[in-house]
A protein has these predicted regions:
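Retroelement reverse transcriptase polymerase core
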Residues: 1-179
Length: 179
């Protein structure tokens, strides 16, 4: 499935192939990750980026009347890797070697890369919190909330990012965030 979606592609040789590790997700499905602690993470210069503190997030949300929670579908895998980084993300599977064309879990820099990317995309969006793949939008009135939400959705669409509609919630008096 990942190959058909262009997330990974088969290759013949790699000096960086990492073994795979299956991770059970909250919904019971399996996520395949590379065990990069044995390869890439040992030698890579780890990218850092400040992650917002919970206090900062709640300061943005304070006074919000209603809240909209936005969930991206396979969030990391929507971020395209540059060409020269791809060979380092190779995984070794029972079906052969595959390199990632998209950001993947297990790479030590992935959370920082993702946070920076999302904050850059949503820069200028008012009353909006981004904590990795958790996006929350509010406003002190319905009109303000809808304007803020429209701004966020337009920027996500402009960046080509897809939502997981089943996990999104709009205009609610309260939502679970960071839970």
């Amino acid at each position: 499935r990942l190959e058909k979606l262009g997330v990974i592609e088969a290759i013949q040789f790699s000096e960086w192939a990492a073994p795979i590790v299956p991770v059970v997700k909250a919904d019971g499905s399996i996520r395949i990750c590379g065990d990069y602690k044995l390869t890439l993470n040992r030698v890579a210069r780890i990218e850092t980026y400040p992650i917002p503190r919970v206090e900062e997030l709640f300061a943005v949300l304070r006074g919000g009347e209603k809240f909209s929670k936005i969930d991206l579908s396979s969030a990391y895998q929507q971020i395209v890797l540059d060409e020269q980084s791809r060979p380092y993300t190779t995984i070794n599977t029972h079906k052969g070697l595959f390199m990632y064309n998209r950001l993947t879990f297990g790479i030590a820099s992935a959370p920082a890369i993702f946070q920076r990317t999302m904050e850059t995309i949503l820069q200028g969006c008012q009353r909006t919190c981004v904590y990795f793949d958790d996006i929350l939008v509010t406003g002190s009135s319905n009109d303000e909330h809808l304007a803020n939400l429209d701004s966020v959705l337009c920027k996500l669409e402009g960046a080509g990012l897809r939502l997981n509609r089943a996990k999104c919630a709009f205009m609610l008096p309260s939502v679970e965030y960071l839970g």
